[in-house]
Amino acid sequence: MDGGPSATAAPRIESRAVSVLLITNDFPPRAGGIQQYCHNLVRRLPPGEVVVYAPAWPGAAEFDAGEPYRVVRHPTSRMLPTADVARRSVELVREVRPDLVCFGAAFPLGLIARRLTRETGVPCAGFTHGVEVAVSGVPLARRLMTRVAGDVRLLTAVSRWSAARVEKGARGRCAVELLPSGVAAGVYHPGVDGGAVRARHGLGDDPVCVCVSRLVPRKGQDRLIEAWPQVVARVPAARLLIVGPGPYRRKLGRMAASSPVAGRVHFTGEVPWEELPAHYAAGDVFAMPCRTRWLGMDLEALGVVFLEAAATGLPVVAGRSGGAPETVVEGMTGTVVDGRRAGEVAGAVAELLADLPRARAMGAAGRRRVEAEFSWEAVVSRLEKLLAEASR
């Protein structure tokens, strides 16, 4: 799920890399998807070519001591495009003398790019995620994002859907390239044993649909619970395992308790990162029927959980939101549904749970696709090429 475990002793790309200063508000040990995205990228680059500038956070000293590259911590727990952050960044660029400055999230920290390049001569690049796409609907934020595009040489996007919207906001002022999230394919794989998780929650050998994510409305756990009576009508032994914490937990619990199939819906609560692979492996099908909310302001830019599930060998039911459909090859590795419609969600999940041999075949196809397109090694190889082009 967002902020999931990284592979230990990650293999690094050994070709000559561009030296990079990563400036980011989002970095471990703080949890989160952007944090893990940045971490998984930099830890696979040659350590002598990377320096990270990130906020202070509880446990940062211990975390930093275990990393092979240098991490410089800002005095506070948040980094915004203030004069102080810009000044400290300029000083660090002058000390480190990187080939390129890269922002872990282009907005809003990318607003200091102009000053950095003007005062140091070092070009800048930035990663984009969901927020940069979402702000395209807000006039002031859209203008600021266009300014960032004019001050950097490269913006990356995690999906083709996101890239199209970033390109629209960039207005041709910089290159926009695809750089999806990767998956630690050695951590999430079909050989992981989910038996202990099944035993813990009394799932036995029943067919299980698992959903791993934060419990927030956009992710669609509510539609899964609403759909579950229809699923059980077709597959009487079917169980739903909802994994993760979040502010929607109480409401979801009330929904499940009032359902006629309440005994077939299970919540795990928050799970340690190292146990997430086993929770995926406890399922036969993965579903997260995400949906876009708030007039496009709340959406799924890609959805790394879909890739983690596929890496584990599960067929995926994804919601039609943002770039999420790009994680599925329709009919081959899973299916895409309208996450607003419980009936459509129920039909897709029940069809897979009712035919587990077909579900396993789709899961195997998903695993092969992850290995070919979404391994961190493949993603970092692409990143190195993009950084080299941006630094010239």
Model-derived regions, located:
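Short hydrophobic beta-strand element within catalytic cores of glycosyltransferases
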Residues: F306, A311, P315-A318, V328
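A short helix/loop element that forms part of the nucleotide-sugar donor recognition site in Leloir-type
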Residues: H189-L203
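Conserved donor-binding/catalytic core segment of Leloir-type glycosyltransferases
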Residues: L21, T156, L203-K219, I225-P229
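Conserved acidic donor-binding segment of nucleotide-sugar-dependent glycosyltransferases
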Residues: T327-A342, E351-P357
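Carbohydrate-associated surface elements
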Residues: W161, G182
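Nucleotide-activated donor-binding/catalytic signature segment of Leloir-type glycosyltransferases, i.e.
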Residues: R250-P277, V285
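A short, well-ordered alpha-helix in the C-terminal region of glycosyltransferases
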Residues: A237, E351, R358-A372
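Acidic donor-binding loop of glycosyltransferase active sites
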Residues: E270, A281-L299, L314
